[in-house]
């Protein structure tokens, strides 16, 4: 597909890499010449130095025959303007990143009036992810499928769980838990395990289950399941605002530390149920004096990654509460993984995942479309949910007879109100939603799960 990408910052760079690696013809537009040169030298993309809201620049980029137009500059208004002009000049699908909370209640109206196909608000998405984690604090990461009915949950395995030396196939009978272990991170590597795989303390385990079954499993392995009742947030930006709104609706006590007095006034007006503290969040004495040690959740949401990391390490030393750390830069995730920062949330990853998911779905003319896509375990594993629209080589055949690709696990089938952890005799049917976890990147369709070389 021909894709025009306006904005070559962190998100734009990640998208340029991902989309070009998937074989798309990508043209990047940015006003910064050095940034454009870096992208064209680093990835298989074309680059144009110019303003994405200029008709001349759009024409030079080939807007007339573009399939997808993506605007991820640092300005919401510019992103919307770019998409509006692109819609007028071409006939492509438009995707805009819009972050300002003042637009949050107007997104549907904006999409309809401007003709944008999709709007992504990474701060709102990050707040929802953090809210899920605070409702299920034993997990370090939670992703949802099947309209929220199925969850992919990650946790760190310690001696307290009593699973050291246990084979995965033993879990259902030993713990009477209907869950499926989908991936294990060990010693820097990632494994898609089979039933004979033996767990070890120190593993990062990702499993799939319904919310009810996940709750039961965590109780049986002595991980906390009670939602937090109070949260201590450092940083009063957009994520803190969205998160606090959701927490207050669920009767969670919220304290926000923000150093900017003007921003404190805004938050006090917008969040009358929260306690707003005007102070430098890096003031350790202040944090301790305000009861950080007794908080059930500590969430570091400043705009500086290094400050968030240090704050979380300090909180880890003094508090037993749930820890959540926001990180913007994508390039240091492998280093951060060794620091045990609790749950690390990357808003920019969420933006990329959503857009890549949308582009892959557009690429399918018919058949099985991607409904949901997550890249997990430091971007090394993809978890995808496909909707089955028509018969194919993957349907109507017992799963035990399907030749699946290596390092791929078919985890779940949802059929109407049924949620199935599939067995060898089960079959995929038209109308099903199918969830797979794989080390292979770039799957576009359910048929891509089959190892065509092994057939026949």
Predicted regions and their residues:
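Cytosolic regulatory regions of ion transport systems
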Residues: 1-456
């Amino acid at each position: 597909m021909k894709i025009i990408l306006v904005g070559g910052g962190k998100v734009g760079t990640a998208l340029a890499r991902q989309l070009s690696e998937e074989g798309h013809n990508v043209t990047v537009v940015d006003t910064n010449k050095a940034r454009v040169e870096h992208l064209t030298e680093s990835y298989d993309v074309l680059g144009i130095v110019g303003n994405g809201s200029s008709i001349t620049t759009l024409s030079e980029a080939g807007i007339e025959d573009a399939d997808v137009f993506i605007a991820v500059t640092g300005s919401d208004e510019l992103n919307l303007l770019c998409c509006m002009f692109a819609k007028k000049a071409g006939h492509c699908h438009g995707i805009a990143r819009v972050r300002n909370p003042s637009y949050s209640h107007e997104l549907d109206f904006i999409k309809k009036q401007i003709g944008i196909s999709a709007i992504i608000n990474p701060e709102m998405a990050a707040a929802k992810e953090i809210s899920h984690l605070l409702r299920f604090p034993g997990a370090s990461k939670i992703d949802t499928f099947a309209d929220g009915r199925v969850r992919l949950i990650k946790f760190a395995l310690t001696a307290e769980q009593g699973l050291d030396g246990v084979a995965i196939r033993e879990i259902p009978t030993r713990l009477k838990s209907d869950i499926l272990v989908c991936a294990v991170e060990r010693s820097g590597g990632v494994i898609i395990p089979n039933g004979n795989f033996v767990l070890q303390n120190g593993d990062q385990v990702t499993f799939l289950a319904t919310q009810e079954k996940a709750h039961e499993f965590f109780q049986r392995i002595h991980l906390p399941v009670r939602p937090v009742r109070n949260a201590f947030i450092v940083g009063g930006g957009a994520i803190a605002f969205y998160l606090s709104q959701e927490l207050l609706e669920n009767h969670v006590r919220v304290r926000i530390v923000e150093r900017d007095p003007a921003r404190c006034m805004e938050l006090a007006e917008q969040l009358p149920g929260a306690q707003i503290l005007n102070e430098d969040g890096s003031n350790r004495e202040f944090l301790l004096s305000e009861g950080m040690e007794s908080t059930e959740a500590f969430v570091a949401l400043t705009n500086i990654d290094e400050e968030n990391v240090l704050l979380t390490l300090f909180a880890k030393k003094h508090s037993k509460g749930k820890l959540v750390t926001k990180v913007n830069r994508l390039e240091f995730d492998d280093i951060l993984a060794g620091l045990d920062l609790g749950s690390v949330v990357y808003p920019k990853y969420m933006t990329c995942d959503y857009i890549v998911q949308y582009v892959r779905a557009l690429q399918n003319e018919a058949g099985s479309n991607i409904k949901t896509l997550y890249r997990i375990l430091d971007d090394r594993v993809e978890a995808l949910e496909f909707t089955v629209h028509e018969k194919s080589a993957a349907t109507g055949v017992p799963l035990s007879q399907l030749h699946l690709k290596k390092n791929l696990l078919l985890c779940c089938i949802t059929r109407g109100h049924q949620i199935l952890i599939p067995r060898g005799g089960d079959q995929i049917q038209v109308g099903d939603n199918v969830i797979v976890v794989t080390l292979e990147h770039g799957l576009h369709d359910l048929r891509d799960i089959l190892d065509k070389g092994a057939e026949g």
